[in-house]
């Protein structure tokens, strides 16, 4: 069954209209997504490798967890659901630190528009890689990397992390000390 999203206005407020995912992307409706960086006690960052069955960017390392906010969900509810669905992590509202929201309009292909309000969160947790029960249809592996390693690999063909997402993580590390 196709996912439905709340259509947002240009300011990120709900319009009261819901549309199926396919229509949201073909018509370019504004909608909300969540992006969660997971960081352990050693300040290592969890990355996921996208499954080789993914249509876009298969076998590529990316942010710890991300996904669309479903119709009727708040941003934090969407983040909690995505962490559970993708990584099997059970978290509560207070476990997530909201960082910021950015507005991005991206035309990735003919008749495919990604007009999103992207909400970023940090999850500090000491979950071990072997404890993560990831969604096999979405993810082929997860791994922790140091900040230095991430800086070294960020511009390689093995990683797809948008510059704005990387910048948010970099600001977090600069401001936390």
Regions found by a protein language model. Give the residues of each.
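Nudix hydrolase/Nudix homology domain
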Residues: 22, 59, 71, 98-105, ...
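Conserved Nudix-box catalytic region and its N-terminal flanking loop in Nudix hydrolases
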Residues: 23-34, 44-81
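Short helix-to-loop capping/linker segments positioned immediately adjacent to catalytic or ligand/cofactor-binding
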Residues: 12, 86-90, 106-111, 130-131
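Acidic, metal-coordinating catalytic segment for phosphate/diphosphate chemistry
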Residues: 1-35, 39-42
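A short coil-to-beta-strand element that immediately follows conserved catalytic motifs
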Residues: 90-100
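Short, charged/polar surface micro-motifs in flexible loops or helix N-caps
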Residues: 39-45, 53-55, 104, 126-128
């Amino acid at each position: 069954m196709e996912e439905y999203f709340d259509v947002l206005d240009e300011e990120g407020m709900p319009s009261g209209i819901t549309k199926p995912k396919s229509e949201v992307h073909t018509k370019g409706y504004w909608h909300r997504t969540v992006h969660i960086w997971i960081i352990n006690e050693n300040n290592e960052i969890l990355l996921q490798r996208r499954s080789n069955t993914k249509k876009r960017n298969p076998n590529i390392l990316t942010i710890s967890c991300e996904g669309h906010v479903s119709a009727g969900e708040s941003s934090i509810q969407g983040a909690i659901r995505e962490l559970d669905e993708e990584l099997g992590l059970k978290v509560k509202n207070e476990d997530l630190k909201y960082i910021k929201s950015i507005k991005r309009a991206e035309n990735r292909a003919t008749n495919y528009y990604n007009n999103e309000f992207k909400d970023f969160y940090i999850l500090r947790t000491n979950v071990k890689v072997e404890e993560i029960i990831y969604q096999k249809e979405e993810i082929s592996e997860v791994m922790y990397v140091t900040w230095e390693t991430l800086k070294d690999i960020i511009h390689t063909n093995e990683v797809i992390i948008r510059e704005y997402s990387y910048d948010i993580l970099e600001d977090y590390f600069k401001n936390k000390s």
